């Protein structure tokens, strides 16, 4: 990703209710992954820009924390209404900026809207606890209070949903927020800020600062930032977690994944194939809940044959085409990295059942890669261990469910796993022994709804409190205990 000098209008940061040009002089291109068309330029903001945003958020917090909870919730209801009004427009922006298929983009917006719905329930979510007579004439109460200024660092693969995981809940809890979106998908963040302001959010409650590494470090290190929420790759997630935690700040860092789908001998083949295809190749495999490894228990050549047939039938192209499922990866540089993984799989002895590289020449204008399937992959191979984040699927073989579960246990990641079976005993064993935080039973993408935590395990998550659900409320609030005596 090359740095260029600005030649055209550059996106601005949103600070204190105003669109503000970055003090930095460099920008990055924001190309459409399907066409290469440059949609905008995003500024490489500076430490000074971050400080300006944090100071605006700090100033806003002084009054926002005292805004009655029902009034905060009403702003969320207004925001929810505006997101619904602009649903189609936002989905088209996701397609243009991220590249995914329109149907998936529309679904992403819907998931984000559901997060705002959850945040709108703040009066219930923020209720404290009390107990009378903990001792004679003594009562105890617990109240929730906001932390202050908090920050979110979000990825390119869900440029709408992940910010909506974070800032609505943080803000309705009484905090103010600084959002650093991915420099690959910055346009949508500005649109969110615009709609949130229209919904009635006061200046400084939500701020957006674009940029790269310097912005991340400046947010982590700023003395007025109380918590960091991050979603991204494993090396960066670990870095963000360690650097933030070392300063005694709250941090939740969602990381990489290697999600295994187990196909049992009694599985309905067509159902399993349909779910694996959608999970592995939807969004070009660029999601942390994507199926990237299938473990076939016993002999099931029918499943393998049908999987390849369905992969061959996939329509590849621009996400605005309603027939398209498989869309481009985000950047040419990422595709080059994926090609290296494919070559590594060949060199390490996996059988290349379907070579997605052949589709590249048909679409030279975009970052396309066809569905790629390796068979007879072993757990020690690179493609079986590392997150590739692309439409590349590994098929592993296991003699029984115990062996299949051992593959999941050996993985450094623990985001999700799925089993396809009709056997209740196998389901229970899988539920109890699969070493991952989100499990699917005949479900291809077992991602949770907003009222449950998004609960990755092992190297898929660094921190104590997950995003969403009660964990999210606990992350963005602190508790104050009051003990009262009445025997005077």
Curated annotation (Swiss-Prot):
- Per the Swiss-Prot or TrEMBL record, the active site comprises 288 (nucleophile)
Out of the domains of life, which is the source?
Bacteria
Q: Which UniProt keywords apply?
A: NAD, Oxidoreductase
EC number of this enzyme = 1.2.1.27
Has the keyword Oxidoreductase been applied to this entry?
A: yes
Q: In which pathway does it act?
A: Polyol metabolism; myo-inositol degradation into acetyl-CoA; acetyl-CoA from myo-inositol: step 7/7
Q: Where does NAD(+) bind?
A: 156, 180, 183-184, 233, 255, 387
- MF annotations from Gene Ontology: malonate-semialdehyde dehydrogenase (acetylating) activity; methylmalonate-semialdehyde dehydrogenase (acylating, NAD) activity
Q: Name one GO biological process term.
A: inositol catabolic process
Q: For this protein, what reaction is catalysed?
A: 3-oxopropanoate + NAD(+) + CoA + H2O = hydrogencarbonate + acetyl-CoA + NADH + H(+); 2-methyl-3-oxopropanoate + NAD(+) + CoA + H2O = propanoyl-CoA + hydrogencarbonate + NADH + H(+)
Q: Which NCBIfam families match?
A: MMSDH (TIGR01722)
What is the annotated quaternary arrangement, including any partners?
A: Homotetramer.
Stored HAMAP family? IolA
- Summarize the protein's role: Catalyzes the oxidation of malonate semialdehyde (MSA) and methylmalonate semialdehyde (MMSA) into acetyl-CoA and propanoyl-CoA, respectively. Is involved in a myo-inositol catabolic pathway. Bicarbonate, and not CO2, is the end-product of the enzymatic reaction.
- Family, as annotated: Belongs to the aldehyde dehydrogenase family. IolA subfamily.
Q: What is this protein called?
A: Malonate-semialdehyde dehydrogenase 1
Name the lineage.
Bacteria, Bacillati, Bacillota, Bacilli, Bacillales
